[in-house]
Amino acid sequence: MERIKGLILTDGARIGIIGGGPAGSFFSIFASKLARDIGKALDFTIYERKTFANHGASGCNMCAGVISESLVQSLALEGINLPSSVVRWGIESYFFHTQNGSVQIKSSRLQQRGIATVFRGGGPAGSLEKDVQSFDGFLLQKAIDCGTQVKHVIVDEIRLDGGKPGLYSGGRILQDCDLLVGAFGVKASTSKMCEKLGTGYKIPPTIKATQSEIELGRDWVASRFGHSIHIFLLRIPGIKFISIIPKGDYITISALGKEPGVNHIKTFLDHPVMKKMLPSGFKIPERFCHCFPKINVGAARKPFANRLVFVGDAGSSRLYKDGIGSAYITSKAAAYTALLHGVGEEDFRGYYLPVCKTLNRDNLFGRFLFSANDFISIIPPVSRCYFKVIQLEQDGLQRNTPYGDVLWDMFTGSRFYKDIFVRALSPWLTMHLLSVMIASFFKKVFFPHTRK
Ligand SMILES: Cc1cc2nc3c(=O)[nH]c(=O)nc-3n(C[C@H](O)[C@H](O)[C@H](O)COP(=O)(O)OP(=O)(O)OC[C@H]3O[C@@H](n4cnc5c(N)ncnc54)[C@H](O)[C@@H]3O)c2cc1C
């Protein structure tokens, strides 16, 4: 594609958005609001194959459904307040469970239950809950309220022949685009279609995850899991970590690893640490709602071209955390670039790419932090000391809670990884942890019979 300068959206310009997940909805919300503010009349259409009304995987964008504290706040500032029909549960703390015990972490920063858990679709397969509103459906409605048209069709072909991208479905043209926004995530064959356009775009690397919805009843969920997300660092082969997210009658079990499967979930539910949290006599259901989505663990190559930009998971996303928050960041940056600067390759390179690069660079620090966390969790003496220090902090025996804050920020995704990295490597923290480990070692050697 030739490089053109001065491509701008003029009155009547048509913007086609493939994907009505968070990234597609955010893009059209921000771009249409900005267009109104600067007095431009633009035409937005989202093409989304799902309606987000069905139960189970067919109506859902398959994720753990944790809306980070920072995103809840950013949305509120945009005037988007999540209603109680969307929020399944408010979260106020995290529990970390290891072979050697559990520790609860709270953050003094968190406003009351400021993290929300949601279902992305109409709820788990087989669920009888009636008052569930999908998070993605809610955002899509916000886009419609801003004047965007939504068409529930699959875009199965894109052509670039006339200079403007053309979208097709079943051989019929849907529209020509003055700007095409790729907000199709990483789960779809659509990404391959875009790679073949020859603009240099390459989809981000992904790993497989597994998600399961287990029904335990609201009372059990409330009493055993509370308003907390539970992270399990249990050294189950093939599993990096497992999170449990309470959602009313259900818990969502989200596992990341090499090739997580249903058997990993069954092994986990049978693990003594987890068994304690299940009703006595609990039997793993024969059938339960589960899926194997892919999770973005890197950056797309060249997520833009003339009249073309890729946002959300199809562009750049934060490692393991806050993917929806990343969709918010990239969609907003792409919308502002398109409306305020132009839709040429050079415009996106100048104003959109730096935002993606910030996320991509930050993920390098995230990768280091998660590797360090893996290392700590797999070596029992180190893991024991680390969680002991955190426990002391949280019990209020120490004034500050730097270790707890590091874990909190890593797992909630509420701070940039670089910032967490700098704090985690502070000489004071490292020396303190080492001194606790050495003290614990000598205690074990010289006073083996004293209690821990
Ligand atoms: C196991 C797991 C757990 C996660 N947990 C969290 C979490 O707790 N919190 C968090 O913030 N993030 C989480 N994420 C990441 C989060 O799911 C993504 O970052 C987020 O969904 C990205 O939004 P998106 O709009 O870019 O893509 P998606 O949500 O994937 O939306 C893409 C949309 O495009 C549509 N589409 C694709 N191709 C076409 C086509 N050709 N025609 C029409 N429609 C099309 C799809 O139907 C879909 O609706 C998790 C991910 C995984 C895999």
Predicted regions, residues:
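N-terminal FAD cofactor-binding segment of flavoenzymes
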Residues: 51-103
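Glycine-rich FAD pyrophosphate-binding loop
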Residues: 32-60
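Conserved Rossmann-like nucleotide-cofactor binding loop
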Residues: 23, 52, 187
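C-terminal helical "tail/cap" subdomain of flavin- and related membrane-associated enzymes
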Residues: 339-452
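Beta1/beta-strand and adjacent pyrophosphate-binding region of the FAD-binding site
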Residues: 6-23
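FAD/FMN-dependent oxidoreductases across multiple families
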Residues: 127, 174, 259-337, 343
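Short beta-strand to alpha-helix junction loop
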Residues: 63-66, 111-141, 189, 212, ...
